[in-house]
Curated annotation (Swiss-Prot):
Residue ranges with Acidic residues bias: 134-160
Protein name in UniProt: Probable RNA-binding protein EIF1AD
GO MF term set: RNA binding; translation initiation factor activity
Family to which the UniProt record says this protein belongs: Belongs to the EIF1AD family.
GO cellular component, one term: nucleus
The species this protein was found in: Gallus gallus (Chicken)
Coiled coil start-end: none
Length: 188
């Protein structure tokens, strides 16, 4: 089976509307991913274990913390006790709730609150780039007092002559730095 055909079948399976769990299957919530296509999950009764992602879902389906899964139990596993059968999307969850098959322990969880929504807090932060911190709470508390914040920013700036990167003793070519400084001071 080609890659495109496989992806088409997996997508069709994930997007099926009417999913009824078999008697041995369980609905679980994803707590995290320790790696190696394993996901730590929690059942409705609070027991935690690892669930493996079968090869058909790898590179085609993405799972994040808080998502719900339908899993098949594995008897021979000590730590890995289940294998994912299906990733439950919002339409699946709504259908299971209407049918009365949704666990009561997860009743408040399917619709995420605004604090849990898909925000930027879970995204990877590139430490090789300068980050600009924006504090919206502080701006709201000030009530539009922009004059004081502008004055604080001016006070924080270092004068050009006091900046450490401009000191001639720190430069590799001291002669050229001194020449540049004299050129700047004289304006020629």
């Amino acid at each position: 089976m080609s890659r495109a055909t496989k992806r088409k079948h997996v997508t069709r399976e994930v997007l099926e509307e009417h999913v009824v769990p078999a008697p041995q299957q369980r609905i679980v919530r994803v707590l995290g991913s320790p790696g190696n296509n394993l996901h730590e999950v929690e059942t409705a009764d609070g027991s935690r274990f690892l669930a493996s992602m079968p090869p058909r879902f790898r590179h085609h389906v993405w799972i994040k913390r808080g998502d719900f899964l339908l899993v098949d139990p594995i008897e021979e596993g000590a730590k890995v006790k289940a294998e994912m059968a299906l990733v439950l999307l919002r339409p699946h969850v709504r259908f299971l709730q209407r049918q009365g098959l949704w666990p009561t322990a997860f009743a408040a969880s399917p619709d995420r609150t605004p604090q849990e929504s898909d925000g930027d807090s879970e995204l990877f932060v590139n430490t090789n780039r300068a980050t600009i911190e924006t504090d919206t709470e502080e701006e709201e508390e000030d009530g539009g007092d922009t004059e004081s914040s502008e004055e604080e920013e001016e006070d924080r700036e270092e004068p050009l002559e006091d900046r450490p990167e401009d000191r001639p003793e720190d430069c590799a070519d001291v002669g050229s730095a001194a020449q540049r400084r004299s050129t700047i001071e004289t304006g020629t």
